[in-house]
């Protein structure tokens, strides 16, 4: 049986408490694609790499999508009302500010295709740590990877000697 439509504005006003750090996401729909509502502020420094595109629509407030584009770090501002389609395989870190709400759509992962969560050194910009996994639950797996990094001093220490953080300082 088909699900009933969801009024996003009503859902957001009734369920803001479900949008908790470090990722602040809640999965509304699953099956073929995952549709998430994501609130701010979030608390993360990781970059997500997945092989499929991600669609961002900013419902309330602005956000910054930090990306590594052809080897260069840069910021993309997605303003309230804007939509943006991020191609697959682009490392990205969505930075969400206080009292902001966005909608994100991600395609279900093909079998055998893994996601990566990586952290770049805050000093030398080299990859300090990376985990790879088959993503079947965006609601929990990204958060679990962030919490594991947060508790692993060895993973957080770069070859250059810099100690890195899972949350912005």
UniProtKB/Swiss-Prot annotation:
Principal subcellular localisation of the protein: cytoplasm
Cofactor or coenzyme needed: Fe(2+)
SUPFAM superfamilies for this protein: RmlC-like cupins
EC assignment: 1.13.11.6
GO biological process: 'de novo' NAD biosynthetic process from L-tryptophan; anthranilate metabolic process; L-tryptophan catabolic process; quinolinate biosynthetic process
Binding site for Fe cation: 48, 54, 92
Subcellular location(s) of the protein: Cytoplasm
Keyword hit for Transcription regulation: no
Keywords: Cytoplasm, Dioxygenase, Iron, Metal-binding, Oxidoreductase, Pyridine nucleotide biosynthesis
Family per similarity comment: Belongs to the 3-HAO family.
Name listed for the protein in its UniProt record: 3-hydroxyanthranilate 3,4-dioxygenase
High-level lineage: Eukaryota, Fungi, Dikarya, Ascomycota, Saccharomycotina
Encoding gene, per UniProt annotation: BNA1
């Amino acid at each position: 049986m088909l699900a009933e439509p969801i009024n996003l504005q009503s859902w957001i006003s009734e369920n803001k408490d479900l949008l908790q750090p470090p990722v602040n996401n809640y999965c509304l729909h699953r099956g073929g694609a995952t549709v998430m509502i994501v609130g701010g502020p979030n608390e993360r420094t990781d970059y997500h790499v997945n092989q499929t595109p991600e669609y961002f629509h900013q419902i309330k407030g602005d956000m910054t999508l930090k990306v590594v584009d052809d080897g260069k770090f840069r910021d993309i501002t997605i303003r309230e009302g804007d939509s943006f389609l991020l191609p697959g395989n682009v490392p990205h870190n969505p930075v969400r500010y206080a009292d902001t709400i966005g909608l994100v759509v991600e395609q279900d992962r093909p079998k055998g295709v893994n996601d990566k969560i990586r952290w770049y050194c805050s000093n030398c910009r080299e990859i300090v740590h990376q985990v790879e996994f088959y993503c079947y639950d965006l609601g929990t797996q990204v958060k679990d990877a962030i919490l594991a990094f947060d508790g692993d001093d060895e993973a957080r220490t770069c070859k250059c000697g810099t100690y890195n953080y899972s949350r912005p300082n």
